Amino acid sequence: MHTFFQQLIGILRWAVELGRINIACEVSILSSFLAAPRMGHIEAILHIYAHLRQHNRSRVVFDSDTVDHGEYIRPDWTDFYPDAREAVPTDAPEPRGKAVQSTCFVDADHASDRVSRRSRSGVLIYLNRSPIVWYSKRQNSVETSTFGSEFVALKAATELVV
């Protein structure tokens, strides 16, 4: 049962790397039980495989259109930062080609692991409308507040973007 569980997790990790973003968090959580899986963990994996079988037409679509910021909660932050200006050098050349926009979504759940009280970070980075980076990972530190766990997730996302 031990090696069977490891094989199933390996296949699911491969599927996540190929673009099945919708199962990234579940696979990450179940990966923490590789050393000593129980029957409930095998059943959870089989549920994921059933989900993949039912939704076998799901795929990542790479779209070159730019993001419409009207879809988000606040596209304009001038209420909070009225004097903020983007510093563009005066001798900068005119942009060529289509516009490229990167958008990053970050989230963390505070102390979601009931045993170790560690939080889990999730990052999804888009280039225009195409996801290019995604992951779900348990944080290395134990944070005492939601703000702390969100900040750790934001730091990890910033390192990926920069």
Regions found by a protein language model. Name each.
Residues 1-162:
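Divalent metal-binding acidic/histidine catalytic loops
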